């Protein structure tokens, strides 16, 4: 065996001369583990002799030491019941399964170890693979994962069944034995790469070959090497471009085989297609004949919904990355001579902001096919080798051309230039392969690629918005992967510092270049640590796990990559960071070579067991303990998970003759574990969370396998041998890299469940119908665009297609019961699924439901949330007789049909967040209904006969209710009001209820929760509900709380009375012994707490956890003793259970206030910070601890213009933990930031840099404390439970007029503006976000149930030590300059944003802009009324220091004062009331939708939804800017404004809002509503296009007697209407009068701004000046551009009008597009008149030939009818509509065609054209005579 130095020498030689083939000895050496020489056992070569004893072909001792995992992983199912300690800790996908099936007979010689080997074998039963071949397979497996830029190079040979690394090397002397390694002889060695499977070398330099040539070569090789069959199935190499997990997977594998009654009632059916089995069985010599082992698959390290507790770091493949580093660095040196080289500044991590305009991925199959191509296009061969003509659509890379910004960086990712990358791109050279591979950019399969793309494009609907977003989405994936996997910017000559620890915690620091190997460092380390000449090694420790590094590892590159994964940037000084202690992230440890052994505790625990179910997790083992060898024959289940270097020798496997369940979870394996295929009796095999790239074909030998779990690996295909696993019932291959459906599994006809989620599968083959027993299939989060026929899958019960790109589904599965289609692109659904019970169609652009099919007959649950429904079909309701659950939230419904009473079995009905104006009385017929949610609608009254329902829960919050139909007397008169007895939860918050409703409320005697917040109640004395436990009365007009009413509430636990006008609290509150939450904030409390006989004192309410007095500015807490003089009545410390105490603005004259601690949050500050008002509101929810911490620093650093506002939200999977971290952060963060601000300076870049480093430093200090906890130190107060605790953080630093915001996690900050807009200052960091998910998977993590590693709800946080480096603390940073329009800053924890959208939050803030405390409380109360029961913290800061001024003005004081108080809409009610109708000079605006008639005729349902969106935008902006809605006619609005500025800013803002709205898919799919961008990529048109016209004048006002609204009459109105008629869609036309008035105002404004003249002097009155100046500021924030259209003739008006067109500044390019379209229009006026002239001239010629009278006329006279004069043209143009022009064009074309036809007829029959005069008319033939001649000729020809 050669030394490592020799090996490197060989590799260097091979890199220069790739034709030199690797020798057998070299291959064996490089495949061996380099740190345990005694593992090098015997190696034998397999033959293809079927009769050979499998024992002769085992691989002894060859293993992969690259594995690590976490504790408490779920165990796989076993064949027999097991002990509880081998229990499940996770979701159903990993639940224990007890199978009592028969076990295959034991062989004569019980070599149980060979069972392991079967999993490492190949498919064919006629051959067994040799060890050398397995090594080659593993080498190629490591090669199979290449970056996007380089993937084309390997596709040429992989796609058509070649080895994938077929090259000149294969021509060597041993080519018949092995396929050559791609580049490096160590490629298949024990240690893999650290590149997340995305770096591997490229094929050596070979000329491109065609697929036919490949097949011929393949067949020749096949004949020479029958044992290398698995190699011939090598999949194509595609780059790793993970997708983001958008929702949790609720479809996990149900692994309980003892309880499969629901899915094992197999419906007998013969597979429709049995050809596949025959093909597979006859494919012994040509692997290409197998139907579809997925020969081409993109890498998909998508988040898997795994369910493991305390997951440890799962690094990419291995921590040892020297192999790829060697290639990358070598490639970099060579790449400098090519155009493909990227400048080091280019690779930057992407930033989500670039894509924030898109709410979800949108479909385009062309983009799907080009999914992973780097920025530069190049030919990508695709596989066409399939026996199934309707097979897989092999995906191809997408063109990626632009860079995006890294979330933690202020710099942008440079766009990739085509010249810099060429066909394969720099990434290919930087990340893998030798120099020689540069020329092997294959052109094989180009024709197939083009054909495939064309076929795909032909299927795809032309939706540019879908296409654009899909392209951006896929591009971002490539950029993210490239950032972490790119070594091109590494300076090979630069020296990097690295700290290496000794086992006694001493350390030394070395300075090395990046390519320094561990072997090179060893002499220095031995000298530094003064050790002898013994054997030493270095381990990398991350979290609790250690990985031994190979001698050829490059620690500098490992350190660099780990730093990047932990949030540091390439622009940071990474070369000197190794000087610092980085053990809070990772550490290198120098220690002697020693075999693993159990400590005493572990050995005792193991010896106490029965050795039947053996648990060896987390023991840092390299081999099984010696003690196990004495009991191997008893072992039935073995769990060796989370042992980074574990290897199971063959002798151990041989002796474990009963082994039926094997778990090797997270063992860091990049190759399939050796010897596993020798465990012949295995029933359950769990290899999840590794980096396995290839399953050996010999897995067919494990024919007893029932359960296989391979989720979260790097698989791109499955081997043909998989088809032999006939007993397989449960298969989980989620979170892998499949682009094509692995068709080989269709031969496993006993499969019951398959999980294929989190891959990138584009289509399902027809052969899937062979799985006739399959009951559950999970395809969550793939790239499917359609689902075809599944009619042969007779037993399919559940199909999960959430988060795909499905536009149509016609599966026809006869027994399908559960279909989940959330977040797709389905606009209509009409599949024939007669047994369907559950249908999820949430977040689909559905505008109507088709009622034609029978799929609803058995349906019990239907979800249509977040669709585009504007109506619900009555016919549809009649077809849902068994429906029990119906969800229609967040649509545009205005009413429910009366036929809803046909849903007689309905139990749950939710129609929240719609526009319902009434509820049909027929709903009272639903006697089974238990839960009714109607919150956030426009209901004024509830239905009749409400008392007949038996509801337990009713939520009608945020409506316009003033009462119920009928009277309470009618309700009482009911013989037995069922509702009074059944109702338990009632929420009627945010309505217009008054005290008259109390008698009705009191009838609900069993009520537990009552929410009457934000109504108009004044008295509460009539409330008598003894069973009430929660009472919410916030935001009413209570002035007192009667003690009599309180006495009846003995069971009360929660009482919310904030936002009232209470002066005192009754002493009877002390009798509520169970009271735990009391909120009386923002009242007018002023009473003596020592007068406890009459007023409330808290001393008897010992269970109080939440007590809030904040906002009571006149309330005093004074020290006073009780009559006995023993106790201080002001002592708040007696409340031992207290968690939150709010005393903001309260006067404290006592010292008996508890100190803030980990268990209590205390607020005692004033509600002012730097002159700005601020307020805080929070609730504990169900938590028993204070998880959230807010803190403000006024005059931060002692400076008047600075303040710091922070909000921290503790996180932990255990609700009782996580609060300690947030408290520690609160105490130390400000000091860290002060220190770094001093270091980096006061400039903008310095501040942002200080903020970023402050978070990283904070994480260092927190994790440093957690490290000490790991070592047994508890001085910090933290415990081991906090190792999985962390905290989100949002920090707002105000300096002067700038706001700097930094955040990690899900605590969001929003800036509300007075113009109705808002700015999101933070970024959401959750695992489901694409950028976050990509980084998680790159670092080796996974996502389960929307939690990172199944633990954290956020992907960035401080803490979570056990999750490093999957989680990090690098913040997103934003910088905002405050403007006049900014009103309020809102910071809140994540639960608020789940229940209230940004728009609602900002509406509330504008409504309460002068009272931020009330705004915060109202947001909290709204969330509670909508159903929130978790903890929330909200912090509001009012930025407007002139809070007492009115925000909206008119020129008339009476108009301002007399704002109306009528609320016709729940949302509008939160805005300013509508202004009174202006009089005098006003601005009249007319609006109209372009081509609305055409759209209504084409898409009536879609237009119904679109019009609602249009009207909402119009009316919302009217309230914000102060306009009066005069009337509407159809889709046209007439609006009046008191000032020109308010009219213009309204028009501009509406145009911008229309562009941002979500329109139905039908509207955006046609030309009139599709996405149009300008040359810079700015969105210019999308959705409905609205024309607007504005005129200024003095119309005649008149009240409409019918509507009682002001109308305007006269010529001013007429002119305004005509001005709007000139506009095109998206334009705002202005009359000359309006422009003149506007210019006058702007001149006044200029005097105020430039000359500083007083408002009264300029405008004549201060009030008017304030109004106009405020509106001008709003206008300047929006921005505007004027374009002169010139004089235009207005229809019906005598004189011309000079028209000006206005555009928002950001949409100025609309003018160029409109002008261009007009000039290039086919139907422009001049062209039509020219065509008429041509027609007339042709007719003149024809008349002359026919002998007409035209020739007698003079040319001058001819022009009279040839062309129109200008006046005639203008008259025609003015009176003609678009349809008139189309008819005119048709008329002219017909005339021209007829004339030309007659001329040609004469020319053909008469031999030419001859002019005749009128006197010669008898000499020429008429046209009818000519036709007679033609008929005669035809008759003669027939005869």
Curated annotation (Swiss-Prot):
Gene that specifies this protein: CYR1
Family of this protein: Belongs to the adenylyl cyclase class-3 family.
Organism: Lachancea kluyveri
A GO term, aspect molecular function: adenylate cyclase activity
UniProt-recorded name of the protein: Adenylate cyclase
Binding site for Mg(2+): 1488, 1531
UniProt keyword list: ATP-binding, cAMP biosynthesis, Leucine-rich repeat, Lyase, Magnesium, Metal-binding, Nucleotide-binding, Repeat
LRR repeats: 632-655, 659-679, 681-702, 704-726, 727-748, 750-771, 773-794, 795-816, 817-834, 835-856, 858-879, 882-903, 905-926, 928-950, 951-971, 982-1004, 1006-1027, 1028-1048, 1051-1073, 1074-1096, 1103-1124, 1135-1160
Biased composition (Low complexity): 212-221, 407-428
Note on how the cofactor is bound: Binds 1 Mg(2+) ion per subunit.
């Amino acid at each position: 065996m050669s030394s490592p130095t020799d090996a490197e020498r060989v590799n260097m030689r091979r890199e220069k001369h790739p034709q030199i083939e690797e020798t057998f000895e070299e291959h064996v050496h490089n495949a061996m583990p380099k740190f345990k020489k005694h593992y090098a056992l015997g190696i034998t070569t397999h033959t293809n002799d079927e009769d050979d004893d499998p024992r002769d072909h085992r691989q002894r001792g060859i293993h992969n030491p690259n594995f690590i995992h976490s504790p408490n992983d779920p165990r796989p199912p076993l064949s027999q019941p097991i002990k509880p300690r081998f229990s499940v800790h996770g979701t159903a996908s990993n639940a224990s399964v007890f199978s009592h099936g028969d076990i295959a007979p034991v062989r004569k010689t019980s070599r149980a170890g060979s069972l392991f080997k079967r999993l490492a074998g190949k498919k064919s039963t006629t051959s067994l693979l040799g060890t050398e071949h397995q090594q080659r397979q593993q080498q190629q497996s490591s090669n199979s994962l290449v970056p996007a830029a380089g993937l084309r190079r390997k596709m040429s040979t992989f796609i058509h069944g070649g080895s994938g690394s077929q090259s000149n090397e294969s021509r060597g002397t041993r080519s018949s034995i092995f396929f050559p390694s791609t580049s490096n002889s160590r490629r298949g060695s024990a240690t893999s790469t650290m590149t997340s499977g995305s770096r591997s070398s490229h094929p050596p330099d070979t000329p491109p070959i065609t697929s036919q040539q490949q097949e011929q070569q393949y067949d020749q090789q096949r004949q020479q090497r029958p044992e290398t069959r698995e190699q011939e199935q090598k999949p194509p190499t595609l780059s790793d471009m993970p997708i983001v997990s958008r929702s949790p997977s609720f479809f996990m594998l149900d692994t309980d085989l003892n309880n499969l009654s629901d899915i094992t009632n197999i419906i007998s059916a013969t597979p429709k297609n049995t050809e596949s089995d025959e093909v597979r069985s006859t494919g012994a010599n040509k692997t290409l004949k197998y139907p579809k082992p997925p020969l081409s698959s993109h890498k998909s390290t998508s988040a898997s919904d795994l369910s493991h507790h305390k997951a440890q770091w799962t690094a990419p493949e291995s921590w040892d990355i020297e192999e790829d580093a060697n290639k990358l660095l070598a490639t970099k040196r060579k790449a400098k001579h090519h155009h493909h080289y990227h400048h080091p500044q280019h690779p930057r991590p992407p930033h989500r902001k670039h894509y924030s305009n898109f709410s979800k991925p949108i479909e385009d199959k062309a983009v799907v096919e080009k999914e992973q191509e780097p920025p530069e296009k190049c030919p990508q061969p695709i596989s066409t080798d399939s026996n199934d003509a309707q097979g897989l659509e092999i995906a191809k890379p997408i063109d990626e051309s632009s860079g995006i910004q890294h979330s933690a960086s202020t710099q942008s990712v440079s766009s990739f230039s085509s010249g810099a990358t060429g066909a394969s791109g720099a990434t290919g050279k930087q990340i893998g392969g030798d120099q020689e591979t540069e020329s092997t950019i294959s052109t094989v399969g180009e024709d197939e690629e083009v054909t495939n793309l064309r076929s795909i494009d032909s299927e795809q609907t032309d939706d540019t918005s879908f296409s654009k977003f899909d392209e951006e989405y896929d591009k971002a994936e490539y950029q993210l992967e490239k950032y972490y996997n790119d070594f091109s910017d590494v300076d090979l000559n630069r020296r990097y510092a690295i700290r290496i620890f000794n086992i006694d915690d001493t350390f030394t620091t070395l300075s090395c270049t990046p390519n320094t190997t561990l072997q090179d460092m060893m002499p220095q380390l031995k000298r530094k640590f003064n050790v002898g000449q013994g054997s030493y090694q270095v381990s990398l420790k991350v979290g609790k796990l250690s990985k031994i590094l190979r001698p050829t590892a490059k620690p500098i590159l490992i350190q660099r990559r780990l730093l990047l994964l932990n949030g540091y940037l390439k622009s940071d000084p990474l070369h000197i960071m190794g000087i610092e202690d980085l053990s809070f992230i990772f550490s290198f440890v120098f220690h002697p070579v020693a075999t693993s052994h159990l400590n005493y505790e572990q050995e005792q625990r193991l010896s106490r067991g029965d050795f039947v179910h053996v648990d060896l997790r987390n023991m840092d083992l390299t081999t099984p303990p010696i003690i196990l060898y004495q009991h191997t024959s008893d072992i039935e289940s073995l769990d060796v998970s989370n042992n980074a270097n574990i290897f199971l020798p063959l002798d151990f496997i041989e002796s474990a003759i009963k082994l039926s369940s094997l778990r090797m979870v997270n063992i860091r394996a990049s190759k399939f574990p050796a010897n596993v295929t020798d465990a012949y009796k295995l029933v359950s095999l769990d290899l999840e969370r590794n980096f396995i790239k290839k399953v050996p074909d010999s897995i067919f030998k494990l024919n007893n396998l029932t359960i296989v779990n391979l989720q979260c690996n790097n698989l791109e295909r499955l081997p043909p041998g998989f088809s032999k696993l006939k007993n397989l019932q449960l298969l989980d291959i989620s979170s892998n890299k499949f682009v094509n459906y692995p068709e080989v599994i269709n031969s496993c006809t006993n499969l019951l469940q398959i999980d294929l989620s989190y891959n990138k599968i584009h289509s399902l083959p027809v052969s899937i119908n062979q799985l006739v027993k399959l009951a559950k299939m999970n395809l969550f989060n793939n790239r499917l665009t359609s689902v075809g026929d599944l009619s042969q899958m007779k037993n399919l019960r559940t199909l999960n297609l959430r988060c795909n790109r499905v536009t149509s589904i016609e599966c026809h599965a006869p027994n399908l019961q559960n279909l989940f289609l959330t977040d797709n692109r389905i606009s209509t659904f009409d599949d024939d699924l007669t047994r369907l019970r559950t249908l999820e169609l949430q977040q689909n652009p559905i505008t109507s439901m088709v009622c034609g099919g029978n799929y609803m007959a058995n349906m019990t649950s239907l979800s249509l949330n977040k669709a585009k429904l504007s109506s619900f079909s009555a016919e549809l309701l009649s077809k849902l007789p068994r429906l029990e659950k119906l969800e229609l939230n967040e649509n545009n419904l205005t009413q429910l049909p009366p036929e809803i009473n046909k849903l007689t079995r309905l139990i749950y009905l939710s129609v929240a967040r719609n526009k319902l104006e009434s509820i049909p009385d027929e709903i009272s017929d639903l006697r089974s209904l238990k839960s009714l949610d109607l919150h956030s609608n426009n209901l004024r009254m509830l239905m009749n006969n409400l008392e007949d329902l038996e509801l337990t829960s009713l939520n009608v919050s945020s409506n316009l209710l003033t009462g119920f139909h009928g009277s309470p007397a009618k309700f009482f008169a009911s013989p037995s009001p069922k509702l009074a007895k059944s109702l338990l939860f009632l929420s009627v918050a945010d309505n217009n209820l008054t005290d008259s409703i109390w008698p009705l409320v009191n009838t609900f005697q069993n009520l537990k929760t009552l929410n009457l917040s934000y109504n108009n109640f004044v008295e509460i004395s009539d409330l008598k509900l003894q069973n009430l436990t929660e009472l919410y009365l916030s935001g009413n007009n209570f002035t007192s709380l009667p003690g009599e009413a309180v006495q009846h509430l003995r069971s009360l636990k929660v009482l919310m009375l904030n936002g009232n006008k209470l002066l005192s609290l009754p002493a009877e509150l002390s009798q509520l012994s169970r009271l735990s939450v009391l909120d009386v904030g923002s009242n007018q409390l002023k009473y003596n707490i020592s007068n406890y006989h009459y007023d409330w004192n808290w001393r008897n309410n010992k269970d109080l956890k939440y007590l809030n007095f904040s906002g009571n500015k006149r309330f005093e807490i004074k020290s006073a003793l009780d009559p006995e003089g023993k106790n201080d009545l002001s002592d708040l410390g007696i409340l031992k259970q207290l968690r939150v105490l709010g005393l903001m603005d309260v006067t404290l004259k006592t010292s008996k206030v508890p100190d803030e601690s980990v268990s209590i949050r205390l607020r005692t500050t004033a509600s002012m910070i730097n002159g700005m008002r601020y307020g805080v509101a929070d609730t504990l929810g169900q938590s028993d601890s204070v998880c959230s911490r807010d803190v403000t620093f006024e005059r931060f650093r002692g400076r008047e213009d600075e303040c710091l506002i922070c909000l921290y939200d503790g996180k932990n999977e255990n609700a009782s933990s996580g609060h300690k971290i947030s408290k520690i952060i609160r105490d130390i963060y400000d000091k860290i930031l002060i220190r770094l601000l001093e270091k980096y300076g006061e400039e903008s870049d310095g501040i942002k840099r200080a903020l970023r480093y402050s978070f990283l430093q904070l994480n260092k200090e927190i994790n440093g404390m957690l490290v000490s906890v790991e070592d047994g130190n508890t001085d910090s107060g933290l415990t081991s439970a906090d190792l999985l605790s962390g905290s989100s953080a949002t920090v707002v630093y105000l300096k002067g007029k700038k706001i700097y915001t930094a955040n990690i996690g899900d605590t969001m900050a929003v800036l509300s503006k007075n113009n109705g807009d808002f700015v999101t200052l933070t970024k959401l960091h959750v695992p489901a976000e694409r950028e976050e998910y990509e980084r998680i998977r790159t670092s080796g993590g996974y996502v389960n149930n929307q939690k990172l590693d199944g633990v954290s709800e956020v992907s960035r946080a401080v803490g979570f030590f056990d999750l490093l480096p999957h989680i990090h603390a690098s913040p997103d940073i934003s910088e905002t300059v405050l403007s006049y329009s900014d009103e309020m800053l809102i910071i809140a924890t994540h639960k608020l944003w789940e229940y209230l959208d940004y728009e609602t939050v900002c509406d509330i803030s504008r409504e309460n802009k002068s009272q931020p405390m009330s705004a915060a409380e109202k947001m909290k109360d709204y969330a509670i009324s909508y159903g929130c029961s978790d903890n929330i913290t909200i912090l509001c800061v009012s930025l407007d220091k002139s809070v007492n001024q009115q925000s909206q003005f008119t020129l008339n004081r009476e108009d301002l004062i007399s704002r109306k108080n009528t609320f016709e809409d729940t949302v509008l009610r939160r805005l300013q009331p509508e202004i009174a109708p202006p009089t005098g000079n006003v601005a009249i605006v007319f609006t109209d939708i372009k081509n609305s008639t055409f759209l209504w005729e084409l898409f009536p349902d879609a237009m119904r939804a679109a019009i609602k969106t249009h009207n909402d935008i119009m009316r919302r902006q009217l309230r914000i800017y102060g306009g009066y809605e005069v009337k509407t006619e159809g889709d046209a609005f007439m609006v009046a404004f008191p000032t020109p500025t308010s009219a213009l800013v309204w028009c501009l803002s509406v145009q911008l809002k229309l562009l941002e709205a979500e329109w139905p898919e039908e509207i955006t799919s046609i030309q009139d509503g599709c996405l149009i961008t300008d040359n810079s990529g700015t969105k210019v048109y999308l959705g409905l296009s609205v024309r607007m016209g504005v005129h200024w004048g003095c119309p005649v006002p008149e009240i409409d007697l019918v509507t009682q609204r002001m109308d305007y009459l006269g010529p001013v109105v007429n002119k305004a209407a005509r001005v709007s008629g000139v506009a095109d869609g998206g334009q705002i036309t202005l009359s000359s009068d309006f422009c003149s008035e506007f210019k006058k105002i702007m001149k006044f404004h200029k005097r105020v701004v430039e000359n500083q003249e007083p408002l009264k002097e300029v405008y004549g009155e201060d009030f008017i000046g304030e109004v106009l100046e405020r509106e001008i500021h709003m206008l300047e924030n929006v921005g505007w551009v004027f374009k002169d259209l010139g004089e235009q003739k207005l229809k019906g008006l005598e004189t011309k009008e000079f028209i000006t067109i206005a555009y928002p500044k950001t949409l100025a390019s609309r003018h160029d597009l409109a002008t261009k379209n007009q000039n290039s229009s086919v139907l422009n006026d001049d062209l039509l008149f020219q065509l008429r002239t041509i027609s007339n001239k042709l007719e003149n010629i024809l008349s002359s030939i026919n002998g007409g009278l035209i020739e007698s006329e003079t040319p001058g006279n001819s022009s009279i009818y040839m062309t129109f004069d200008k006046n005639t043209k203008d008259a025609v143009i003015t009176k003609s509509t678009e349809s008139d022009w189309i008819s005119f064009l048709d008329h002219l074309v017909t005339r021209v065609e007829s004339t030309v036809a007659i001329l040609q007829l004469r020319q053909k029959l008469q031999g030419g054209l001859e002019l005749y005069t009128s006197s010669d008319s008898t000499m020429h033939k008429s046209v009818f005579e000519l036709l007679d001649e033609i008929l005669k000729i035809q008759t003669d020809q027939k005869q």
